[in-house]
Design a protein with these regions (language model features):
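Flexible loop/hinge segments that line or gate small-molecule binding clefts
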Residues: 139-183, 267, 293-305
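Short, solvent-exposed amphipathic alpha-helices that sit
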Residues: 89-105, 183-186, 209-229, 271, ...
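Short beta-strand elements in bilobed, periplasmic/extracellular small-molecule ligand-binding domains
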Residues: 102-115, 201, 219-242
């Protein structure tokens, strides 16, 4: 039976104190980098339990530590979208961070808008040269069949939000979302604690996976509190054409108005507030409204909008990490990552 290697054995080999070796192995205290590396290298060589199966200090370790660079003939990171992404869209700041993270790869990020015809015919944008493309990041690409076509390209691919995935085969790509459930449920709980009983949802739950998750979080919350009356007055018109007018017509037909609305995003919430005002209701005096995204407009809209904050910087950092590691290791299992969100209480919920 092999003799168990101890910290004292390593200390004896290196003629160092046991305390110094312990600091290096447990990553505690202050040590010179050279000393720490020498100890860890010796621990790996001797087969110490934490390092026996880890090739941390192989001769080619220096090679693996070298910065990863894209091949010279594939330096383009392509961003695909079906929409014009204004500075108000959460992805604006996210993409700034994403681009900053990939700059060291000597790559260029190009933006390609998918036209309605290209979307329908499942064709790539004419501006995109797939032969020069190292990876693709998709934002606002919510057509499932088109997304499947992109997955079949055999190009490293990341979706920031996706089409609704309920009861569908998963996309063969990495997926990045903001956390959609926890803070929606906290928003509902806040409304219930403040005496609101009829709580409804506004927004097209089938627009994208995030909207669907927000709706399901809302539904689970009202069912948990036993307040299901609000389910009958949800305002969920589908489609994007003339949405404010469609939303107005939807709520105008309600015989009973909710006490509060949870909305799919801030822009739905702002359209809803305007529609309620036109119908003679005051927010928050008569009806409370909560959005999602914490867009720039949310803080200066009248009334200032309670919303759920998306951390664009961490989304940008995570997006870069997911896509770059996919380019480096194409055989990795597909990953689904959620980043933290936070409820921000403002005037539209009486705060």
């Amino acid at each position: 039976m092999a003799t168990k290697v101890t910290i004292q054995d390593i200390a004896n080999e290196l003629q160092l104190s046991r305390n110094t070796v312990s600091k290096a192995i447990n990553n505690t205290g202050v040590l010179a980098d050279a000393t720490r590396e020498k100890i860890l290298r010796k621990a790996a060589e001797m087969g110490y339990k934490q390092f026996a199966y880890l090739p941390l200090f192989q001769e080619d370790a220096a090679k693996t530590a070298e910065p990863f660079l894209l091949p010279s003939d594939k330096r383009e990171i392509a961003m695909l979208t079906t929409q014009f992404l204004s500075s108000s869209h959460f992805s604006s700041m996210m993409l700034d961070r994403f681009q900053a993270e990939i700059d060291h790869l000597h790559s260029g990020m190009t933006i390609h808008r998918i036209s309605p015809i290209e979307l329908k015919e499942k064709k790539l944008p004419s501006s995109l040269d797939i032969q020069c493309t190292a990876g693709i990041i998709c934002i606002e690409v919510f057509d499932y069949d088109y997304a499947q076509m992109l997955c079949d390209l055999d190009v490293p691919l990341l979706f920031v939000d996706t089409p609704v995935m309920d009861m569908r085969p998963p996309l063969k790509a990495d997926r990045l979302y903001m956390e959609n459930r926890i803070e929606i449920q906290n928003a509902v709980a806040h409304m219930v604690q403040r005496g609101k009983k009829r709580i409804s949802f506004a927004g097209d739950k089938n627009h994208c996976q995030s909207f669907f998750e927000r709706y399901m979080a809302y539904k689970d919350a009202v069912e948990y509190f036993g307040l299901t009356e609000g389910l009958s007055t949800c305002a969920m018109p589908s489609g994007q054409q003339n949405y404010p007018a469609t939303l107005y017509e939807t709520i105008r037909r309600f015989k009973t108005m909710p006490d509060a609305f949870v909305c799919a995003n801030d822009f739905v919430a702002m359209d809803l507030v305007k529609a309620l005002n036109e119908l003679g209701y005051s927010v928050p005096d008569d009806i409370w409204v909560c959005g999602f995204d914490d867009s720039q407009e949310a803080s200066y809209f009248v009334p200032r909008l309670t919303s759920i904050h998306i951390h664009e910087q961490i989304m940008g950092y995570t997006a870069a990490n997911l896509l770059m590691t996919r380019i480096e290791e194409p055989s990795l299992n597909y990953r689904t990552v959620y980043t933290e969100t936070n409820l921000i209480l403002r005037e539209s919920t009486g705060d």
